[in-house]
């Protein structure tokens, strides 16, 4: 029977990886967060500007109730667009960070370039398939959630390893087009019997999250890389080199 690491062992692996290099880990996660936040602000500002230009001035609102409704709809539309855009950016940045952590675990002496590494998912090599995985998993999870919230959560964990599988398969077969749907299916198969274990791993960070909030958010600078890297450590433990060539060991 295959033996897998405990939550404590996975976290210990992450802390050992970051020993003396927490600065690299923090910068790797911080820069995408700042970019996403700036993009969010830009979209909000542009949306409000468009709303103001296409509607009657404020002093005329009392003469036409429909105008204020239009402004409200425009504002809500702008907020919705900014939320969706920032959500997609945040998800893709997280994928790029996870890719970097995967390389880092396999090469503990890897030199980290925060901007370049966190943006790697936007390269020609990864972007299209990674984006398709995001779209497909979002659709599948939403459809399952329509039945009841629990099936949606279960599917979220079933699909959780698709991005890392995609990265490994791209490395394993660089001249082949990797199917996003196949990566999702492979993740479902890989996570059979392990979804609860992964769920408990993520829940184990709740206490750290509370402390990060109490520190006025400063603690998240350490928590985000710690949590993201531990998820990758879980994948490494789960696959045990399944998608690697012999020369990669």
Residue ranges of predicted features:
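Hydrophobic alpha-helical membrane segments
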Residues: 1-249
């Amino acid at each position: 029977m295959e033996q897998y690491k405990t939550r404590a062992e996975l976290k210990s692996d992450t802390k050992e990886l970051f020993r003396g290099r927490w600065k690299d880990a923090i910068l790797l996660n911080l820069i995408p967060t700042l970019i996403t936040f700036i993009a969010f602000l830009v979209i909000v500002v542009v949306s409000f500007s468009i709303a103001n230009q296409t509607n009657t001035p404020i002093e005329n609102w009392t003469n036409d109730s429909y105008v204020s409704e239009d402004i409200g709809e425009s504002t809500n539309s702008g907020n919705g667009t900014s939320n969706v855009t920032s959500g997609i950016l945040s998800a893709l940045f997280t994928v790029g960070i996870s890719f970097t952590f995967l390389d880092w675990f396999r090469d503990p002496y890897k030199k980290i370039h925060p901007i370049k590494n966190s943006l790697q998912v936007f390269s020609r090599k990864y972007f299209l398939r990674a984006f398709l995985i995001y779209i497909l998993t979002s659709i599948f999870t939403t459809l399952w959630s329509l039945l009841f919230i629990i099936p949606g959560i279960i599917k979220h964990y079933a699909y959780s390893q698709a991005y890392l599988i995609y990265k490994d398969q791209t490395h394993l077969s660089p001249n082949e087009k990797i199917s996003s749907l196949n990566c999702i299916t492979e993740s479902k198969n890989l996570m059979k019997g392990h979804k609860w274990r992964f769920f408990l791993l993520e829940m184990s960070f709740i206490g750290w999250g509370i402390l990060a909030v109490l520190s006025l958010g400063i603690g998240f600078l350490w928590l985000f890389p710690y949590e993201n890297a531990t998820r990758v450590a879980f994948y490494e433990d789960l696959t045990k080199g399944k998608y690697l060539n012999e020369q990669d060991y």
